A protein has these predicted regions:
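Nucleotidyltransferase catalytic core that binds NTPs
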Residues: 2-236
């Protein structure tokens, strides 16, 4: 079954002005998922970088995902009062980051929903649009797993989706015993991904841009060009 056409678009790039949030044409918005396991990678994506793409690719390769949806958060609840770039720029950067890879699609469901962007609400919405034979896999790094107790309804998250947890420098993957102690039999739905970890963060990229330093090869080239063209992250 296809995901709702108003909420998921293929990663083709259209024209978008600064501060303008638009949806793609109908043909681009319809993602023909077609069964199997569907990865979900949420984030602020301010900006998206190769660490995000590598984590998604690591999960897809290990678990045989048919598609990975990148889901920018409109109002990330964990950011608090921390400033976040406008939604239009973050959506466009994410679209550009994934445009060249057919594995990826862009989900705008959190951009279209009012209120804080809680992952559990997004999974409920996505789950309702899928067949029973289709499985959602929530992709995260080990630091997110360590903090997931502070997320809204973490146990419900594990009911709605399997978890794929990748490595992050300074955050070792948990052992199976600890996961079973916390989640019981549901721990079998948590997949630990072995592979290289990249010591990279969006905040570090923003700092480098503000300092006038290169971000070449830390973000996709099209994302770098958009950051330069729009003067994003430069100190006033």
């Amino acid at each position: 079954m296809s995901l709702p056409s108003t909420r998921v678009e293929h990663a083709g790039v259209g024209t978008i002005g600064a501060g303008e949030l638009v949806t793609a044409p109908e043909a681009e918005r319809t993602a023909l998922i077609g069964g199997g396991r569907i990865g979900i990678l949420g984030g602020t994506f301010d900006p998206p970088h190769i660490g995000h793409l590598w984590l998604a690719t690591l999960a897809a390769d290990a678990l045989g995902l048919s598609r990975v949806l990148l889901m920018p958060a409109a109002r990330p609840p964990h950011k608090g009062a921390q400033p976040v770039s406008n939604a239009a720029d973050r959506v466009m950067m994410t679209r550009l980051a994934i445009a060249a890879d057919p594995l990826f699609d862009l989900s705008l469901i959190e951009m279209e929903r009012e209120g804080p962007s809680y992952t559990v609400d997004s999974l409920v919405e996505l789950r309702a649009s899928l067949d029973d034979s289709e499985t959602l896999v929530l992709i995260m790094a080990a630091d997110s797993l360590a903090e997931i107790g502070s997320w809204r309804e973490p146990d419900r998250l594990l009911e709605l989706a399997e978890w794929a947890v990748g490595p992050r420098p300074g955050w070792p993957l948990p052992d199976r015993g600890a996961l079973h102690e916390r989640y019981g039999e549901a721990a079998a739905r948590i997949h630990l991904l072995e592979g290289p970890s990249l010591d990279l963060s969006s905040s570090e990229i923003r700092r480098r841009v503000a300092a006038g330093r290169s971000i070449r090869y830390l973000v996709p080239r099209a994302v770098e060009e958009l950051i330069v063209d729009r003067g994003l992250y430069h100190q006033p």
